[in-house]
């Protein structure tokens, strides 16, 4: 939730929301949770090296796909009755990075395990493989937030809004393999 989360990314979002509310322009806020694709981008090196790196511990991640979030935006834009509302959106079924590694293993037939790193070590690793410092630090910060419950939501607001279940982790992994 942008109301309670303290990560740098969420702080920036709160400032944007406050500016929008002060503008007087009619709005509806879609607070998208984490995107499944954010983690699936790391699947190729995880499959190559047999390890999925992160700093989320066993924190539950209620991610959804870009397509799921886009469907929600389309509904809100095309239907009446959403003005002034704030929607906290997330996937239906939360998972851990250990579970993601296991799903990659199951579907690919290759062994993949999850290795949890400290936030600093994860950021340094991401920088070491070429990510810009700001992005590496934001991703490591988000993972650390996930370890504390910052990427968990069980409200099912997204699936209620789009009128169907959100895309499962298994479906998402299948789509990239």
Model-derived regions: residue spans:
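Mid/C-terminal beta-alpha module of Rossmann-like enzyme folds, strongest
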Residues: 70-138, 149-177
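Conserved beta-loop-beta element that borders a ligand/cofactor-binding pocket
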Residues: 15-51, 55
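Short, glycine/charged-enriched secondary-structure capping and boundary segments
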Residues: 8-14, 42-48, 102-103, 129
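Residues that recognize and position ribonucleotide moieties
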Residues: 28, 45, 62, 93, ...
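A conserved pocket-lining segment of Rossmann-fold NAD(P)-dependent short-chain dehydrogenase/reductase
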Residues: 45-64, 81, 88
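Short, small-residue-biased leader/transition segments that mark boundaries at the very start
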Residues: 1-6
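Short-chain dehydrogenase/reductase
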Residues: 7-14, 59-67, 90, 94, ...
């Amino acid at each position: 939730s942008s109301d309670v989360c303290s990560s740098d990314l969420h702080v920036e979002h709160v400032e944007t929301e406050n500016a929008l509310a002060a503008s007087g322009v009619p709005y509806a806020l879609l607070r998208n949770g984490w995107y499944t694709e954010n983690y699936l981008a790391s699947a190729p090196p995880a499959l190559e090296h047999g390890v999925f790196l992160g700093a989320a511990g066993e924190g539950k991640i209620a991610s959804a796909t870009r397509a799921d979030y886009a469907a929600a935006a389309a509904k809100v834009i095309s239907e009446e009755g959403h003005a002034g509302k704030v929607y906290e959106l997330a996937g239906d079924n939360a998972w851990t990075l250990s579970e993601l590694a296991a799903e990659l293993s199951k579907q690919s037939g290759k062994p993949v395990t999850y290795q949890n790193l400290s936030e600093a070590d994860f950021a340094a690793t991401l920088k070491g493989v070429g990510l810009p410092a700001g992005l590496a630090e934001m991703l490591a910060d988000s993972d650390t937030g996930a370890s504390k419950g910052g990427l968990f939501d069980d409200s099912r607001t997204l699936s209620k809004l789009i009128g169907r279940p959100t895309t499962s982790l298994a479906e998402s992994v299948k789509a990239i393999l």
